[in-house]
């Protein structure tokens, strides 16, 4: 009976995996190390209506996916990433939004002996409030201390763990005595799957403005290279035409070659006074406008002075 129930459960699990991959075009492969059952329940609740969490044995997940490759061969890209304590989070919504929800579900946790530190752990300089009898813990970890007002005081900030270190019994005991919970655990996004493409979660942080800026920089670099080697492309063509026109004007200015665009330049070269006259003519309207504004600004002042004078005479006549 037990064997039949287990076989039926496996069959239902395979069907569920296939249905989820057919229904949802996007999913995360998530790591679930150190995530307890209560925290997992809270995560499922927070994602309700937005995403579906599927956990299971790696062998069963691989078997279900392989059995569905005939209908969806793109799923084969997921197989190399199903290793360790992992699961799937399926969604139809915005990937970045779901990822942020997963990050919010992380909870602080104390350091336990045997755990692997995922980050740097530093004990800050502080008065611990512990009595002198606890000095041995600090000495075992080479932490400089002094006795201040009958309690142990840590003199300097002390790095106690770095990423990849195994937490020892002394480190775990000391951190717990100081009420320091250095780690936070939750579902960690390892890979993102979207309609047949699989990529790193860091890609979700790239914004449209970043893509636009990178594209524009790439076009500018391409144009610069093409200009330097003399190879015409769409990116470099406007610059090549402008440079060619400048060269053509330079040739026309020093030879008898005539064309419409070079006429003005030739006239200025023959008679520089024309250029000076044109420059002064263009500057005159601007200067005239400024003078008029100054005169207009002065007018109200003079008018107000006259009005004041009139008022004065009227009062004392």
Swiss-Prot record:
Its EC number is 3.1.-.-. GO terms for molecular function: calcium ion binding; class II DNA-(apurinic or apyrimidinic site) endonuclease activity; large ribosomal subunit rRNA binding; magnesium ion binding; structural constituent of ribosome. It is an enzyme of class 3 (hydrolase). Residues 291-302 have a biased composition (Basic and acidic residues). It is found in: Cytoplasm; Nucleus. Keywords: Cytoplasm, DNA damage, DNA repair, Hydrolase, Nucleus, Phosphoprotein, Ribonucleoprotein, Ribosomal protein. Residues 280-290 have a biased composition (Low complexity). Its main location: cytoplasm. The modification Phosphoserine is found at residues 302, 304. Residues 280-317 are annotated as: Disordered. SUPFAM superfamilies: Ribosomal protein L10-like. GO terms for biological process: base-excision repair; cytoplasmic translation; nucleic acid metabolic process; ribosome biogenesis. P0 forms a pentameric complex by interaction with dimers of P1 and P2. This is Large ribosomal subunit protein uL10. It comes from Drosophila melanogaster. The gene is RpLP0.
